A protein has these predicted regions:
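Bacterial N-terminal signal peptides
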Residues: 1-8
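Short, solvent-exposed loop/turn segments enriched in Ser/Thr/Gly
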Residues: 35-42, 89-99
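Buried hydrophobic-core signal for structured, non-transmembrane domains
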Residues: 41-47, 84, 98-103, 115
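Surface-exposed binding patches on compact interaction domains or structured appendages
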Residues: 50-79
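Beta-sheet-dominated interaction scaffolds and their linkers
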Residues: 12-48, 119-121
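Short strand-edge motifs at loop-to-beta-strand transitions and within beta-strands
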Residues: 27, 78-84
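Terminal connector regions
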Residues: 92-121
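Short, acidic/polar linear motifs in exposed loop/turn regions
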Residues: 48-51, 90, 106
Length: 121
């Protein structure tokens, strides 16, 4: 009976697929004025899985934040990056929190990045 259970346990512990690991999942831009220039952040990520990874979309929740990213395949072990731009002039005054959703072919599903700042007039 043990020989039937052991192969199942081994295969369950090593699923195949792409996996995305973000450099960070929180970006703190600090205190900004609505008159400040766009804030540009480059965020790196890597494919820690064993199949190719493609970032298919990075969704933002407001017009003050944009993201540019590559849609090229990342082989296992390779790194990529995305450029996140936030325009304080388009952000409301006060504490600013936005969640970016990273959609990819990773087996773990959608990853979230929190962008935060304090916006002053």
């Amino acid at each position: 009976m043990l020989s039937m259970v052991l192969p199942f346990m081994v295969s369950a512990a090593t699923p195949e697929g792409a996996e995305i690991e973000l450099q960070t999942n929180v970006i703190d831009l600090g205190v900004l004025s609505q008159e400040d220039d766009k804030q540009i952040v480059r965020l790196s990520y890597s494919n820690t899985g064993d199949l190719p990874l493609v970032v298919t979309e990075v969704a933002t929740s407001c017009s003050c934040t944009t993201v540019k990213h590559s849609r090229e395949k990342l082989m296992p072990g390779e790194r990529g990056s995305m450029t996140i731009a936030m325009d304080p002039a388009k952000a409301p005054e006060g504490m600013f929190y936005r969640v970016l959703k990273v959609y990819s072919t990773a087996r773990s599903g959608v990853k979230h990045i929190t962008l935060k700042a304090e916006i002053k007039n």
